[in-house]
């Protein structure tokens, strides 16, 4: 877990790790090797995914479109394979996120979901793309107590999936039960 007060640089660090910003000094190591991450696409190819505090979802779009935004499944000619995206999105909703209610389908729009459900979609997307490292930027921000507990259970479950996570927050109570190690940014 990476903990620090507002303005300590937590979100900036996330953006360096995920390729949004290039560092002005220092080094980034991943899997024991020094790396230079020049873009979001490169960090994704390396196996790094991010779940941002704003969740990076499009409210007006259906869940299947949100899950595959920017990484659509296409055929050899570049045409979208909508049926396959919908089928894979159903798997993600059921198997990765645990949505079993018929009220939430791949055609549901994000704006109709609760904060925790939106966070679940963002988590499912990060797991589907076979990430080795999931960077979580204040994933419990603005969530109810029950939704926060679901998020914390998800983070705890990453160990069972042999995934690593950087859980960034300013609330030590949220990260205490989910993290193995703590770094405090001051």
Language-model regions: role of each:
Residues 1-186:
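Glycine-rich phosphate-binding loops of nucleotide-dependent enzymes
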């Amino acid at each position: 877990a990476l903990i620090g007060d507002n303005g300590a640089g937590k979100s900036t660090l996330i953006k360096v790790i995920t390729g949004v910003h290039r560092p002005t000094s220092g080094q980034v190591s991943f899997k024991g090797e020094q790396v230079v991450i020049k873009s979001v696409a490169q960090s994704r190819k390396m196996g790094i995914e991010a779940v941002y505090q704003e969740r990076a979802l499009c409210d007006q779009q259906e869940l299947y479109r949100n899950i595959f935004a920017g990484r659509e499944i296409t055929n050899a000619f570049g045409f979208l394979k909508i049926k396959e995206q919908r089928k894979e999105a159903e798997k993600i909703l059921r198997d990765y996120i645990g949505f079993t209610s018929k009220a939430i389908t791949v055609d549901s729009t994000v704006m109709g979901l609760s904060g925790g459900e939106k966070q679940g979609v963002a988590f499912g997307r990060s797991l589907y793309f076979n990430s080795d490292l999931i960077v979580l930027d204040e994933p419990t921000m603005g969530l109810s107590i029950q939704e926060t507990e679901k998020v914390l259970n998800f983070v705890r479950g990453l160990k069972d999936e042999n995934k690593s996570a950087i859980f960034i927050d300013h609330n030590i109570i949220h990260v205490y039960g989910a993290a193995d190690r703590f770094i405090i940014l001051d």
